Amino acid sequence: MSPCKLLPFCVALALTGCSLAPDYQRPAMPVPQQFSLSQNGLVNAADNYQNAGWRTFFVDNQVKTLISEALVNNRDLRMAALKVQEARAQYRLTDADRYPQLNGEGSGSWSGNLKGDSATTREFSTGLNASFDLDFFGRLKNMSEAERQNYLATEEAQRAVHILLVSNVAQSYFNQQLAYAQLQIAEETLRNYQQSYAFVEKQLLTGSSNVLALEQARGVIESTRSDIAKRQGELAQANNALQLLLGSYGKLPQAQTVNSDSLQSVKLPAGLPSQILLQRPDIMEAEHALMAANANIGAARAAFFPSISLTSGISTASSDLSSLFNASSGMWNFIPKIEIPIFNAGRNQANLDIAEIRQQQSVVNYEQKIQNAFKEVADALALRQSLNDQISAQQRYLASLQITLQRARTLYQHGAVSYLEVLDAERSLFATRQTLLDLNYARQVNEISLYTALGGGWQQ
């Protein structure tokens, strides 16, 4: 049988060669089968949870605009996309080793002696060379599969960066709006303190108050000015953080009215299975890494067996270009080669041990990812009801403080209480308003965290 007829048969045989990689089995989830949920924000148990696109989840148009801008300009996302391209090219490079390689060559030479008393000798040659490794034991196949899984892992890593960016931009925007609101409250409180100071000063002139009350009024004014300076610094830092995420330094949003309607509530079925975590890109990335490690075991096992390569070529040579392709000037060759590992001081066994250990590490990493994801969802669910209860209590407390302050001012005007009573009521009201803002912001961030922990933020 000629080499040309033998080569296709060898190619087909090698491409369908066996694989020594262990059969892949997804590790069991090391977490409970279901989440323990309260009744807040749940839908019917028969309904299935589906992640809404971020354009649906975020109702605030300003948030949508900022996220769209960040997805275009953010450098972290660009870097993730470039890593995907690199991994895709690496996979193509490794996979190319599984197929025959064909190369052409041509050359010409001229020679003669320096005296010039003899004719110049000319020699021309051309040829084709083919080489192919017979992958009977799946070494190249498993190496290619490992690179394919690495490529798929980088795609999931890009999705994770995308989701994290959507979450961070939204949280950064709400943090900026919180800084605006805190600054506004501090400025309003300063104006109220200044009015109180003017009133106390007037009473001092009429003898209805004393210098101590006036100094107390001046003290809270200066304290509030200090708080305003602090809030201005926080606002500047929030703006800087938002610009970094956006990847541009254009005009930033000004103070907006932000409330609970700025995003949708994540509604979950009462029997939410933990299996839903498997759609998270970081967990899918870890699983692809595990599958790559599994394939590397197959490649390491194949190193214990013989490797066979085939080399074949045809060539012609002539001193005249016109007769270069004459049949009489051509020749062919076929060179099969086999390499059998005999002694390598335990190198192959060490490589196999490394591959198996790395596969075990990948299993641990996969399980850790699932446990961390379960904790993130469980924490967000636990915090959701707690924040709602805290906000309700703070709202009632705020209403009570407003009444207390009004009555304290009335009693002070009639001389029934000292200015210290008014001052305490004003301070409590100021602190409670700021606390309520912090709680509302925390509720928004927690809802975004729950949405992200469940894998939301990839689709529009």
UniProtKB/Swiss-Prot annotation:
S-diacylglycerol cysteine: lipidated positions: 18
Localization in the cell: Cell outer membrane
Keywords per UniProt: Cell outer membrane, Ion transport, Lipoprotein, Membrane, Palmitate, Porin, Signal, Transmembrane, Transmembrane beta strand, Transport
Keyword Transport (UniProt): yes
Stimuli inducing this protein: Transcriptionally regulated by CusR in response to copper and silver ions.
Membrane topology: Multi-pass membrane protein; Lipid-anchor
Superkingdom, natural source: Bacteria
InterPro entries associated with the record: OMF, OMP_efflux, RND_efflux_OM_lipoprot_NodT
Similarity comment text for this entry: Belongs to the outer membrane factor (OMF) (TC 1.B.17) family.
Matching NCBIfam families: outer_NodT, PRK09837.1
Protein name: Cation efflux system protein CusC
Originating species: Escherichia coli O6:H1 (strain CFT073 / ATCC 700928 / UPEC)
